């Protein structure tokens, strides 16, 4: 077909630039790899006509005959312009991406607007298709992202429960309540041996990165950094009220709470020391409750300051009077609300609950402040509501039945008794060994005593022999 001649179809037309002076060859058919081998030499490359800018390919590209994407897309990879196609031997091996590169060049031509089929080809070449793009998106890994690994959960070590509470320790109960309010994903270990904690004290938090935090307010600060913040919706005024009431609790209510459980002789012997002695393993139950009492006495001295022994009775009356005023103020601030700042709990509710629940649930023989607290009905209902809502089984008097309670308990009972007996024997052996090594106890071999007439009889026998 000679270019520049009259159009052969209604769709074709004369180029707006006029008929082309050079002749070219357009051949539609099979791929050049299937053509027979040529025997005659190649025809020379036709020179571009004078007065026309660009090569034959550029002029052919700008022709309006190439404006139809549907007609062109069928022949992508089978169209050669300007000269006869060479033989496969002369061209050499064709790379696999030749058809894709030709399609990409045809799509980049300014005279072609991509149609449905052209857009599909371009998407397959450039992006690998929608399925491949989604597959590659799933394989993408961002900086700092762990592939195939999940972060270790946070672990909270706290004192075990008693008296109908999830924990009998003030700090442990406050941290545990705050975690329940925020829904923090914690793996809770309720233990009665502080030496099993990673820090040696309770409560303690082991973060997902392995860091150990043992101070209660630092534990709560870490939970807030992990986006578990119970005070997120509080206003500036409510935040200021939280700080004010927290200071009031530490200054007015905490000294009386320490005095009630650890200093008052009757309460300490019949309630506090009894619970810790029964919960702790041997031999910690012999000396650890007394050590904890001394620590709380030092803490109370820091809170109240130094005072003379004769002023202890007057100081105790003053502390209990201020504590009753603090409870009355809390009752007035709570009113008929579910929580101190509305229908959602905050950090203040966690600390107030930990203070009030210990006073309310423990069966104290000497409960001066407990009587006043039970007279404030809204505070009692407040504690009961939190226990039933956030600790339905931990705070209940009757714990839920286990599915297989007989198996592990019956197996552990003889081993527990055996361990206790072995511990006692090991302690006795250590004491006896220490006494022998230090010289407190010495073992001497006893010489046999001779009878009184033995020496006289021996002397008589010697005289007879002489």
Curated annotation (Swiss-Prot):
UniProt keyword terms in alphabetical order: Isopeptide bond, Membrane, Mitochondrion, Mitochondrion outer membrane, Protein transport, Transmembrane, Transmembrane helix, Transport, Ubl conjugation
Compositional bias segments (type: Low complexity): 1-19, 90-110
Xref: Gene3D superfamilies: 1.20.1050.10
Location in or out of the cell: Membrane; Mitochondrion outer membrane
One GO CC annotation: cytoplasm
Cross-link Glycyl lysine isopeptide (Lys-Gly) (interchain with G-Cter in ubiquitin), where in sequence: 187, 190, 227, 317
Annotated Pfam families: GST_C_6, Tom37
Main location: membrane
Residues annotated as transmembrane: 421-441
InterPro entries associated with the record: Glutathione-S-Trfase_C_sf, Glutathione_S-Trfase, Metaxin_GST, Mito_Protein_Transport_Metaxin, Sam37/metaxin_N
Bilayer topology: Single-pass type I membrane protein
Domain of life: Eukaryota
Post-translational modification: Ubiquitinated by PRKN during mitophagy, leading to its degradation and enhancement of mitophagy. Deubiquitinated by USP30.
Regions of compositional bias (Polar residues) in chain numbering: 20-36
Gene Ontology terms: biological process: inner mitochondrial membrane organization; lactation; mitochondrion organization; protein insertion into mitochondrial outer membrane
CDD domains linked: GST_C_Metaxin1_3, GST_N_Metaxin1_like
Region (Disordered), start-end ranges: 1-133
Subunit record text: Interacts with MTX2/metaxin-2. Associates with the mitochondrial contact site and cristae organizing system (MICOS) complex, composed of at least MICOS10/MIC10, CHCHD3/MIC19, CHCHD6/MIC25, APOOL/MIC27, IMMT/MIC60, APOO/MIC23/MIC26 and QIL1/MIC13. This complex was also known under the names MINOS or MitOS complex. The MICOS complex associates with mitochondrial outer membrane proteins SAMM50, MTX1 and MTX2 (together described as components of the mitochondrial outer membrane sorting assembly machinery (SAM) complex) and DNAJC11, mitochondrial inner membrane protein TMEM11 and with HSPA9.
Protein family membership: Belongs to the metaxin family.
Role of this protein: Involved in transport of proteins into the mitochondrion. Essential for embryonic development.
Protein name: Metaxin-1
């Amino acid at each position: 077909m000679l270019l520049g001649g009259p159009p052969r179809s209604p769709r074709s037309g004369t180029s707006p630039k006029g008929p082309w002076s050079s002749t070219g060859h357009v051949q539609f058919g099979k791929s050049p790899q299937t053509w027979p081998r040529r025997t005659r030499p190649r025809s020379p490359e036709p020179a571009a006509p004078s007065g026309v800018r660009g090569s034959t390919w550029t002029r052919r590209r700008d022709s309006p005959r190439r404006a139809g994407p549907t007609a062109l897309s069928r022949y992508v990879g089978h169209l050669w312009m300007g000269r006869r196609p060479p033989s496969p031997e002369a061209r050499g091996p064709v790379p696999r991406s030749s058809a894709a590169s030709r399609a990409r060049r045809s799509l980049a031509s300014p005279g072609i607007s991509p149609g449905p089929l052209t857009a599909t080809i371009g998407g397959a070449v450039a992006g690998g298709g929608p399925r491949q793009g989604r597959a590659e998106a799933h394989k993408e890994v961002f900086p700092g992202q762990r592939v195939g690994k999940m972060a270790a959960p946070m672990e909270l070590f706290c004192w075990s429960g008693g008296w109908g509470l999830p924990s009998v320790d003030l700090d442990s109960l406050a941290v545990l309540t705050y975690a329940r309010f925020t829904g923090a994903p914690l793996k809770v270990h309720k233990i009665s041996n502080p030496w099993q904690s990673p820090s040696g004290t309770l409560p303690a938090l082991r973060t997902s990165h392995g860091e150990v935090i043992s101070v209660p307010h630092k534990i709560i600060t870490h939970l807030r950094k992990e986006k578990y913040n119970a005070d997120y919706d509080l206003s500036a005024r409510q935040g200021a009220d939280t700080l004010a009431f927290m200071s009031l609790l530490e200054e007015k209510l905490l000294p009386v709470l320490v005095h009630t459980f650890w200093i008052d002789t009757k309460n300490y012997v019949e309630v506090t020391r009894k619970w810790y002695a029964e919960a702790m393993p041997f031999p910690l139950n012999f000396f650890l409750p007394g050590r904890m009492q001394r620590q709380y006495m030092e803490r109370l001295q820091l809170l109240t300051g130094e005072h003379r022994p004769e002023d202890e009775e007057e100081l105790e009356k003053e502390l209990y009077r201020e504590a009753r005023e603090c409870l009355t103020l809390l009752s007035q601030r709570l009113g008929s609300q579910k929580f101190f700042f509305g229908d959602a709990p905050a950090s203040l509710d966690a600390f107030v609950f930990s203070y009030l629940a210990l006073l309310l649930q423990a069966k104290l023989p000497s409960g001066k402040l407990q009587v006043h607290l039970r007279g404030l009905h809204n505070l009692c209902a407040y504690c009961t509501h939190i226990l039933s809502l956030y600790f339905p089984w931990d705070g209940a008097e009757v714990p839920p039945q286990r599915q297989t309670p007989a198996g592990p308990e019956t197996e552990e009972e003889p081993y527990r008794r055996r361990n206790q007996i072995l511990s006692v024997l090991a302690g006795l052996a250590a004491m006896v060994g220490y006494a022998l090594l230090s010289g407190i106890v010495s073992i001497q071999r006893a010489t046999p005593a001779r009878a009184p007439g033995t020496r006289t009889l021996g002397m008589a026998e010697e005289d007879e022999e002489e």
